């Protein structure tokens, strides 16, 4: 029996929906659609993170179906060797900025899904290079009981370009030690010990009541746009509850990116 297609869903910073895909297979598009339409998810969401790190699967039709959720207009998506799968024109496509997280353990159909989302202009890829295993395969049983798996066809995107064994290079590369990435994947908020700072110096010596939190690019843009003074920027924020900090470098970068896009879009429209 197949496991859950979506293993985790969470809202970060109040309006960024995070969906972790466990495996690309039959039912994934429905699982993503349910998560998106859940009360408290789609309402007021300004960005979406699809985490395809450590995701695999060999159902390329399911990859195309999941990507189709984000495409408004009819266009070719993927050719898995059985003809081109096309997106259908729809009025209910998920139309928010999307960041797709990938790494070396993003394999097969998960790679194809990421590639389609990027090719259609739907998403940006962040993280590390993917496995380069997106291909149609066939298994042959051997006399000794071993099953030999052989690639029989290449996976092609809608424009005819093939997914190669080189893998996908993200639009924004975020280098993370593989062992550390697994730990962050299990708990994005944990702090991994790297250096021993003397007490009273640097971050270790900061006082939580008066320390100004580190600003990301999006917050800096907001403060500049709103014309906040330097004094107000540096003023203590004693009344604000301290929020947990996302330590996962890839996830944190995606949150910064989507927060920035959410701030820029209204400025462009105005």
Regions found by a protein language model. Name each.
Residues 1-270:
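C-terminal "post-core" interaction segments
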